[in-house]
């Protein structure tokens, strides 16, 4: 896909305490590589990836495919950057809420992140995936799977245990979030009769996307 050659621009925001592995997770997803030497994110950064999304009907794929440009925003987990992070909440259409399986404190802080997310996101029930990262370190694990799944069930969101080091469930977690977002947008399109693809110039596409996003964000 060339620049501007896409049907939808989707912005995802990675949230969680500093050190849970947000940067390495996103790097694994976009580049399929692992770099354990990333320094702590200062402020906010983002990565990009183009993907093809195939719509799913009750009996499987419908054959309709969309070209999606993903912007994956990587936020700083430190308290001093919290106000900067929350400023990006309203622009994001989905959230990767992450904790470190080897840190009980990062798991306990998920509730704080969820409170901030619910207070600042584009709608009351945004699309979220809960991620327990660093699944490749079982000997250092402090959070058991049942704990995490119970929390995910409380918030009615999917849960994945991932590893940026091995790639375990990284793509699956992002694809699940994208699927939730696209289905929400499809429902909004059906209700408002907005064309589900916008042809013409790239600026026309963005106008169409913003219109769909605004109507879906309620």
Curated annotation (Swiss-Prot):
Q: Name one GO molecular function term.
A: G protein activity
Q: Per the record, a Pfam family?
A: Ras
What are the start and end residues of every segment in region (Disordered)?
193-218
The motif Effector region: which residues?
38-46
Kindly give the Gene3D superfamilies that the UniProt entry links to this protein: P-loop containing nucleotide triphosphate hydrolases
Tissue specificity field = Expressed at an extraordinary high level (0.1% of total protein) in urothelium.
Q: Which enzyme type, at the first EC level?
A: hydrolase
Q: Which cysteines are joined by disulfide bonds?
A: 123-188
Mechanisms controlling activity: Regulated by guanine nucleotide exchange factors (GEFs) which promote the exchange of bound GDP for free GTP, GTPase activating proteins (GAPs) which increase the GTP hydrolysis activity, and GDP dissociation inhibitors which inhibit the dissociation of the nucleotide from the GTPase. Activated by GEFs such as DENND10.
SMART domains recorded for this chain? RAB (SM00175), RAN (SM00176), RAS (SM00173), RHO (SM00174)
Q: Which function does this protein serve? A: Small GTPase which cycles between active GTP-bound and inactive GDP-bound states. In its active state, binds to a variety of effector proteins to regulate homeostasis of late endocytic pathway, including endosomal positioning, maturation and secretion. Plays a role in NTRK2/TRKB axonal anterograde transport by facilitating the association of NTRK2/TRKB with KLC1. May be involved in targeting uroplakins to urothelial apical membranes.
How it assembles, according to the record, is: Interacts with SYTL2, SYTL4, MYRIP and MLPH. Interacts with RPH3A and RPH3A. Interacts (GDP-bound form preferentially) with DENND10.
Name under which the protein is recorded? Ras-related protein Rab-27B
Biological source species: Bos taurus (Bovine)
Instruction: Write the gene name.
Output: RAB27B
């Amino acid at each position: 896909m060339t620049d501007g050659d896409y049907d939808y621009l989707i912005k995802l925001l990675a949230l969680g305490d500093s050190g849970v592995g947000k940067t390495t997770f996103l790097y694994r997803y976009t580049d399929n590589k692992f770099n354990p030497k990333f320094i702590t994110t200062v402020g906010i950064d983002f990565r990009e990836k183009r993907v093809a999304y195939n719509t799913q009907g009750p009996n499987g794929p419908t054959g309709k495919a969309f070209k999606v440009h993903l912007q994956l925003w990587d936020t700083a987990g430190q308290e001093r950057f919290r106000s900067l992070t929350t400023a990006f909440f309203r622009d994001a259409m989905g959230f990767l809420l992450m904790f470190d399986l080897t840190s009980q404190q990062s798991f306990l802080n998920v509730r704080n992140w969820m409170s901030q997310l619910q207070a600042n996101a584009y709608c009351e029930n945004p699309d979220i995936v809960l991620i327990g990262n660093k699944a490749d370190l079982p000997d250092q694990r402090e959070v058991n799977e049942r704990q995490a799944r119970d929390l995910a069930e409380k918030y009615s969101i999917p849960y994945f245990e991932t590893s940026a080091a091995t790639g375990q469930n990284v793509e699956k977690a992002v694809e699940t979030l994208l699927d939730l977002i696209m289905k929400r947008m499809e429902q909004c399109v059906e209700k408002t009769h907005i064309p589900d693809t916008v042809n013409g110039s790239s600026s026309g596409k963005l106008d169409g996307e913003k219109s769909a996003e605004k109507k879906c964000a309620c």
